[in-house]
Amino acid sequence: MIDFSFSIYDLEYFLLIFVRVSCFVYIAPYFGMNDTPARIRIGISFFTSILLYETLTPADAVVFDTVMEYAVIVMKEAIAGLLIGFGANICMAVVNFAGSIADMETGLSMATLLDPATKETTSITGVLYQYSFMLMLIASGMYRYLFGALADSFTLIPVNGVVFHADSLLQSMTEFMSDYILIGFRIVLPIFCVILLLNAILGVLAKVSPQLNMFAVGIQLKVLAGLTAMFLTTGMLPGAADFVYQEMKKMVVSFIGGMM
């Protein structure tokens, strides 16, 4: 006979799972976008928490005497979920950085666009790259890895078992930030090389024919050359996305390891 009993202790345990999951969904790539309806976020968090609750074995460590102690446990679970989602979301920020470099080189940085995902003013190419990488994140099934990592975190880090190691988390952030600029330049390296070659050609022409207004001509040629290079290198985006997703996996694993 199936037992459907549900006590107050089960509710407290379920709420702790829900807090970690909802905080992860709030900041995770694609699901944490501002234009994602709040009902969708809550629904995903709620049903994911139900599945995890039915799968996990309640830990005996969830013991507290006062409301303040329970509030501290809730806060720890919230921070754990935010850190796991932040580890994945920070890797997608590299895409916006790469788009800003491309626009700065091609001259499109003068034209900005309101990003509906973040409600911030950003570069046109940055928005294009961001949505391209988001679509590939869904098409490649990378979102399943993120939710799988979240589910595994409850095994590695039980509820009320979060222990923050500041040195490990700081080291993970430092290692990633050292590669942040390098990853961004790898994405836009073809465009950067084309514009660099064009600048060299314009510099030679300016010396050969000083009467020509190379500034006016160069602005138009940079935009045309940049868009052409961007179009020709579109086939390289899946490879760049795979590289970013590998970095995303490393960050999520390192952040989970910093809370064990």
PLM region descriptions:
Residues 1-260:
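Hydrophobic alpha-helical segments and their helix-loop boundaries in membrane
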